[in-house]
A protein has these predicted regions:
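Acidic donor-binding helix in nucleotide-sugar-dependent glycosyltransferases
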Residues: 1-2, 163
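Short, polar N-cap/turn motifs at the start of nucleic acid-interacting alpha helices
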Residues: 10-17, 159-179
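Ser/Thr-centric signal marking residues that sit
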Residues: 35, 149-152, 163, 175-176, ...
Length: 201
């Protein structure tokens, strides 16, 4: 919900930051995040900043081709809604994708790029010289799983738990430690070696 809640006004390329101040919920409503700790400013790296800058330019071109002007209030992750204006003419507006549609897109993207599979393939087609597969019974990467991976990687890289907690937006460090970080084998080996050093003194 937090990623779908981001608008361009939440992105500061000079400071290399994203402001998390709202989430887009399953009932298609923008709401404040779950807790005060969930409202946060995330530092981002140069690669993500460059990607977002390129995406903003690409999105502006996509909008212009549809007769729309990009605004700072537009979502970073967008969809289009087609309807009728007051005079009954077809109109296109910018909206946010539903969580369901985003999840479907994410699964298809992962399958098409080798990060997931469908156990029951219902359709295959070629686009731009690449085979695309659609189906049911997905297994592979899921967006929420990436949060667990990020938290675990940060702890494994010796980022302190309070900083990881703040980045995840958790009200409690115990939530981060108990549910979002996972044991890393190399760290267990290091712990054994530290114990050996301590016990030999």
């Amino acid at each position: 919900g937090e990623a779908l809640g981001l608008s361009w006004l939440d992105y500061d390329p000079e400071a290399m930051e994203l402001r998390i101040v709202r989430q887009y919920t399953s009932d298609k409503t923008l709401r404040p995040p779950k807790s005060e700790m969930s409202r946060r400013i995330l530092s981002i790296d140069k690669a993500l900043t460059e990607y977002l800058d390129k995406w903003k330019t690409m999105q502006r071109d996509i909008f212009r081709r549809r007769g729309l002007e990009q605004k700072d209030t537009d979502p970073i992750v967008h969809a289009f809604s087609v309807g009728k204006d007051a005079d009954g003419f077809r109109s296109i507006s910018v909206t946010r994708p539903s969580g369901h549609n985003y999840s479907r897109w994410f699964r298809d993207f992962c399958v098409d790029n080798g990060y997931g599979t469908y156990s029951d393939v219902t359709k295959q087609f070629m686009r731009d010289g690449k085979l695309h597969t659609r189906g049911t019974g997905y297994s592979g990467l899921v967006p929420h799983g990436l949060r667990h991976t990020a938290a675990t990687a940060l702890v494994a890289s010796n980022v302190d738990l309070k900083t990881v907690q703040a980045r995840m937006g958790h009200a409690s460090a115990s939530t981060t430690a108990n549910f979002y970080t996972h044991a890393i084998r190399a760290n267990d080996r290091n712990a054994a070696e530290v114990f050996e050093l301590l016990s030999s003194k």
